UniProtKB/Swiss-Prot annotation:
<dbReference type="InterPro" id="IPR023412">
    <property type="entry name" value="RNaseA_domain"/>
</dbReference>
<dbReference type="GO" id="GO:0050829">
    <property type="term" value="P:defense response to Gram-negative bacterium"/>
</dbReference>
<dbReference type="InterPro" id="IPR036816">
    <property type="entry name" value="RNaseA-like_dom_sf"/>
</dbReference>
<keyword id="KW-0378">Hydrolase</keyword>
<dbReference type="GO" id="GO:0045087">
    <property type="term" value="P:innate immune response"/>
</dbReference>
<dbReference type="InterPro" id="IPR023411">
    <property type="entry name" value="RNaseA_AS"/>
</dbReference>
<feature type="binding site">
    <location>
        <position position="91"/>
    </location>
    <ligand>
        <name>substrate</name>
    </ligand>
</feature>
<feature type="active site" description="Proton acceptor">
    <location>
        <position position="43"/>
    </location>
</feature>
<feature type="disulfide bond">
    <location>
        <begin position="83"/>
        <end position="134"/>
    </location>
</feature>
<feature type="disulfide bond">
    <location>
        <begin position="90"/>
        <end position="97"/>
    </location>
</feature>
<feature type="signal peptide">
    <location>
        <begin position="1"/>
        <end position="28"/>
    </location>
</feature>
<dbReference type="GO" id="GO:0003676">
    <property type="term" value="F:nucleic acid binding"/>
</dbReference>
<keyword id="KW-0732">Signal</keyword>
<dbReference type="GO" id="GO:0004519">
    <property type="term" value="F:endonuclease activity"/>
</dbReference>
<comment type="similarity">
    <text>Belongs to the pancreatic ribonuclease family.</text>
</comment>
<dbReference type="GO" id="GO:0050832">
    <property type="term" value="P:defense response to fungus"/>
</dbReference>
<dbReference type="GO" id="GO:0005615">
    <property type="term" value="C:extracellular space"/>
</dbReference>
């Protein structure tokens, strides 16, 4: 009986550790960045770049290959202006989302292969509207009444 119990605890510990690691979201913002600064890093790209190199800048913060990411080819101030459109419901049910008035140039990067740091992406260029979640700015954010903090979806 005793040997079975000895084998149980390390397995339970391993299971609990696995559950704890699974709770760390890939999109968790890096320490020292506001949510809006992290949004800017992940989603604002006025001049289009190839997905492999653009995603390298994001993945270095998380030490993982992010599965999917959308880059908006607009300056941050233009994306922040979207926060002034009427509130709509986000995918998660929150009511702090806003949709762009018109379609914008954007690039969607989808992970095709690789393990960090050798992540490989397929890119898809589109001209579509988008939805972002907005919140009041934090210290260090640009001066806007609301700033984008989460990319919700392409519409």
């Amino acid at each position: 009986m005793a040997p079975a119990r000895e084998g149980c605890c390390p397995l339970l510990l391993l299971l609990l550790l696995g559950l704890w690691v699974a709770e760390i979201p890939v999109s968790a913002k890096p320490e020292g960045m506001t949510s809006s600064q992290w949004f800017n890093t992940q989603h604002v790209q006025p001049s289009p770049q190839a997905c492999d190199s653009a995603m390298r800048d994001i993945n270095k913060h998380t030490k993982r290959c992010k599965d999917l990411n959308t880059f908006l080819h607009k300056p941050f101030s233009s994306v922040a202006a979207t926060c002034q459109t009427p509130n709509i419901t986000c995918k998660n049910g929150h009511k702090n989302c806003h949709q762009s008035h018109r379609p914008v140039s954007l690039t969607m990067c989808g992970l095709t292969s690789g393990k960090y740091p050798n992540c490989r992406y397929k890119e898809e260029h589109q001209n579509k509207s988008y939805v972002v979640a907005c919140e009041p700015p934090q210290q260090g954010d640009p001066e806007h009444s609301l700033v984008p903090v989460h990319f919700d979806k392409v519409v």
